[in-house]
Amino acid sequence: KKEMILIIGMVAILAMVPSACADAIIIDHTCTDLSEIPDEWIDQSKDNLHIAYQHTSHGSQLVTGMNALKNFPAFGLKYEWSDSGASGLDLDDKGIPGEKPDLSQGDYIDGNGVTPWVTATRNLLNSTDNYHVNVIMWSWCSINGHNISRYLENMEILVSEYSAGGSNPRAAEHPVKFVFMTGHAQGQGEGGFIHTANEQIRQHCLDNGRILFDFADIENYDPDGNYYYDRPMWDDLNYTKISYRDSNWGVEWCTANVGSELEQLTTGNNVEGYSGCSSCAHCGLAGAGNTMNCVLKGRAVWHMMARLAGWDGGQPEQPICGDVTGDGSIDTVDLVLLLKHCINPAGNPIANACTGDIDGNGYINVLDVRLLMGYLANPTGYSLNCLYAGV
């Protein structure tokens, strides 16, 4: 009783502690194995996602890769997609009209006080004709030398306005998910601007629970996990082995893995009715080994779509909402720790931040303590709604 009285008396002085509960979705070189994706989530993405994607040549690599999967005979209609949404996944290619066609050309502040691609996205999403659109993607051409902080700040403007709980009226019933993206290799190696820029974007997405299509990471590794960015390497998968730009990991991998599904998707080798991946922007002519760059990115797109549709990516079972001690049960010990955490987070760490954000609003504060108190008193009368946590 004394413990509960103390808790009640201290509730009013609790601080608001960010929970960082919503896990980031990072789509990188580890997300290119189609066999990992359950069929049901491929179907769910086709049924529920409506994507608008804006890009120029480098960004087209994703679409070229998706077309390779779509046209590969062994897959049938499994990876069907259409620009109009008439069949398969609904992806409106180059679907965000505006002053500038990609992030690189739109790296400035326009008359609305934001980047032109934010203005273009707002114009698209504010039209009731586009209330079905629930995923927005913008890609870079060259990221080299661009203002990455400006990019992140302007992406966050869109997130704050149109994502779940956003300030724009359409967010209440038609929320939108926004995909961040890194930029392609240009032979700089790890000491160059591009690597630093990509790392800044990655860290931002990890810290803020964002969705990232890691364009750069996907092309930095071959399918066996060998890393090439530090050789250095370029956007066509060329890299320096002995002399400047003398090798290509896509060509080498295909030569060493003839007859594999990935090699056949890339080259069309011994596949009746299929001549390989079509010409991949900046990467090679149709069927060349380095068009694997597009194939891998197309595979990763489907991995991302399944995640956006609700697939957990095969992650371990989520923790129990309210179980801030991590002992597998919810009791007054959890309530005391949650209270102490709100007063002094550093001195009273909890097992998993997600489990303390009881109302799922992104913060741990007085409301979460009150909900947990109510739940302990009357479990059937209170709902625990931690983001990405089981009850």
Regions inferred by a protein language model and the residue ranges of each:
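Mobile gating loops/cap/lid regions near enzyme active sites that modulate substrate access
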Residues: 222-273
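N-terminal carbohydrate-binding/catalytic regions of secreted carbohydrate-active enzymes
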Residues: 25-134, 285-286, 296, 300, ...
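Cellulosome-associated attachment modules in secreted, modular CAZymes
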Residues: 316-391
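Extracellular-facing segments of soluble proteins and assemblies that are Gly/Ser/Thr-biased and enriched
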Residues: 106-192
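Sec/Tat signal peptide C-region and signal peptidase I cleavage site
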Residues: 18-22
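Bacterial N-terminal signal peptides
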Residues: 7-15
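Substrate-gating cap/lid alpha-helix
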Residues: 183-224
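Extracellular low-complexity, Gly/Ser/Thr-rich intrinsically disordered linkers
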Residues: 252-316
